[in-house]
Regions:
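Active-site-proximal binding-pocket segments
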Residues: 250-251, 255-329
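Active-site Gly/Thr loop motif
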Residues: 262, 273-288, 329-379
Length: 402
């Protein structure tokens, strides 16, 4: 009788253990080496080939209706803004593209996966990882520190300017002085100011112009607002902390170790240059708003997705701390569907009703997205699909998994 009483407890523990194992990918997952990536047929890994084919057709059928010319696409998206003029590079995009990665292997691909296209706000996920690297290496002590304490006066680089050097203090106002790295990462800072010719209120302004300028600021952490001026202020602050261009940091600590190719570029604006240790350095942008941001191919996006699937670990090497990934996946109080930029969460099933609660997505305009699903050891890169079709795409991919 005593043994029988213990049996339900044992079964419950076994069930709990099994569920926890489903929340993270298998230890034997394949990691692609530089310059190559093994392909497997869906059926060889137990997937339904017909369902996979249906998901690809769905992606093609639901191609984004925005123009492929990104100059026109930006105008249609942001043309109502008072400071909508592009100041960074914009490029025409390619065809609808994607790859499906299961247990590390590519089981399907379509479009032009080698083409380096703008990825828009997926760039923000790369930016937050670079901030995380600074925390991991002790350059930033903790994310609850104020940003201002880490910044010197910043000299703008303008070789045509013959007068005294121009200095900027982006975190010196009474409101900005108390902003922490955490609220900047979560887009709950309500940072105020103008950077690279773009005022904070000029990004996605409301319908009442009289409220654009001079309004009372929201207390940090209380209101979530997607705002690229503030993202770019974070990128500038992070550049100062690293004392080097952020693309070099990303290349050294993330992209080279995961075997990314040589065609990705992280661009800034033509006027976003500072003097850093006597050298001109471009402060990159956190997305494609006004141009710039990350230009990258689908394969390299997939490698980054695999890195985040494995909580910062690449084939046994911890590139970004698991603690940082955990923080990135912690819901923001003012917007529980958002962690650190640009880790969109599914904890309430609102983003992707068809996906598991612990799935997350790196999303950029276009729509470009990297779907990461630890419960199924799955990553999907989908580019240039209608935003409303995201869940339908994920639903069809998941239908192929037994």
């Amino acid at each position: 009788m005593k043994n029988l009483l213990c049996l339900p407890i044992f079964l419950f523990a076994l069930s709990t253990h099994a569920q926890s194992q489903k929340s993270k990918p298998a230890e034997t997952s394949y990691f692609p080496p530089p310059g190559e990536w093994q392909h497997r047929s869906p059926s060889s890994l137990g997937l339904d080939s017909t369902r996979i084919a249906e998901s690809i057709q769905f992606a093609l059928t639901n191609e984004s209706k925005m123009p492929r010319d990104q100059q026109l696409a930006q105008a249609e998206t942001f043309g109502r803004e008072p400071y909508d003029e592009p100041i960074g590079p914009l490029a025409a995009r390619g065809a609808p593209t994607g790859i499906i990665i299961y247990k590390g292997y590519i089981v399907a691909e379509w479009g032009e996966p080698l083409r380096s296209d703008m990825t828009n706000s997926v760039t923000k996920s790369f930016l937050s990882v670079v901030v995380g690297l600074a925390v991991d290496q002790g350059l930033i002590r903790k994310v609850t520190d104020t940003v201002n304490q880490y910044l010197p006066p910043i000299e703008l680089y303008n070789p045509l300017h013959t007068e005294s050097p121009q200095l900027i203090y982006p975190f010196e106002t009474p409101h900005n002085k108390v902003l922490t790295w955490d609220v900047m990462l979560r887009q709950t800072s309500d940072w105020e100011g103008t950077l690279w010719g773009k005022p904070d209120w000029g990004d996605r302004p409301g319908n009442k112009p009289e409220e654009w300028v001079g309004r009372p600021r929201n207390a940090p952490g209380t209101v979530w607002k997607y705002n690229d001026v503030r993202v770019n202020a974070l990128a500038l602050a992070t550049t100062c902390v690293w004392r080097k261009p952020l693309p070099q940091v990303l290349k050294t600590y993330i992209m080279d170790p995961i075997g990314a190719g040589s065609t990705w570029r992280w661009n800034g604006y033509r006027n976003a240059w500072i003097v850093l240790d006597g050298q001109p350095v471009q402060s990159v942008s956190g997305g494609g708003h006004w141009g710039g941001g990350m230009f990258i191919n689908a394969y390299d996006m997939g490698r980054f997705g695999l890195l985040t699937l494995h909580r910062g670990n690449w084939n046994g090497r911890q590139l970004i701390s698991e603690q940082w990934v955990k923080q990135s996946l912690t819901p923001t109080t003012a917007n529980p569907g958002y962690g650190y930029m640009n880790w969109f969460l599914n904890t309430d099933h609102k983003l992707l009703p068809s996906a598991p609660l612990n799935a997350f997505v790196h999303i950029g305009n276009g729509t470009n997205f990297i779907y990461v699903d630890p419960a199924h050891d799955l990553v999907a890169v989908v580019r240039w699909i209608e935003n409303a079709a995201m869940d339908g795409m994920v639903k069809r991919i998941l239908a192929a998994i037994p």
